[in-house]
């Protein structure tokens, strides 16, 4: 990682009453320091501030680290949402924001 290089990223796609967590990523060299959790908390706060009730996401079945983070953070598995279709390689999750 060079000086000034991005370490982590994430985004929200806002919808009517819900948002989709998009492109959350921490560079491998910075993992294990709590950045993923901090980024997720920041995105949840931003969603709440925008009046969002539900936060949803799609991730791959092989992304075990992300699945663990989301489950520990209160996300539960659901079926496809939005424009997604059933996909055996995808996991769909949501969390109610209070």
Predicted regions, residues:
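Acetyl-CoA-dependent GNAT
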Residues: 1-22, 27-29, 40-42, 46, ...
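Active-site acidic-Proline motif in GNAT/NAT acetyltransferases
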Residues: 27-29, 33, 61
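Short, intrinsically disordered/low-complexity patches at protein termini
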Residues: 31, 44, 88-91
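Short coil/turn segments at alpha/beta junctions that flank glycine-rich nucleotide-binding fingerprints
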Residues: 33, 49-53
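C-terminal "cap" of GNAT-fold acetyltransferases
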Residues: 53-56, 60-73, 79-98
